[in-house]
Amino acid sequence: MMSDGFDFQVEDILEDFRDMLETKGLSDLVFDYSGFGSQGDGACFTGDIDLKNFLDAHPEVRNNHRELYIAVIPFDGEEPACDYYDIKLTKIVGRSSYSHENTVHLGSWDYTLANKGGGNEREYTYYENLFMNAEKDIEDVCKAYMRQLYRILEGAYYKEYEG
């Protein structure tokens, strides 16, 4: 995280934002920002996405990707059809020194099929397509959170320095 020597309570803001994002299915968050008033300023974060919790917290995404949601929820105590794990929101490294929503992307979708004979290529392709179809919507939600975080940080900065 970059602070550029700002005196306002960045840590408190980030901790509150982290707590909010954790209720939305995001965890292991690392924040970065630059500001305020230059081209390329912004805020971003990287971390892990618990797909089921993320979809539960974002009904607009869940409703657009019902098949994916059904694949990741257990029914009647059974394992979900697709056991998902390690979905990463990663920072694009080396592209720029900026810290804003366009410097991150979904990095990996790792998943396994439930123990039903180990799955086959057709099943893997099916679930991979479900994930890939949802990728843009999931990124868009995360990027909206990044813009929201930047607005909060920017507001706190100007309140502190311009009173």
Describe the function of each predicted region.
Residues 1-163:
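Alpha-helical propensity feature that highlights long, continuous alpha-helices across diverse contexts
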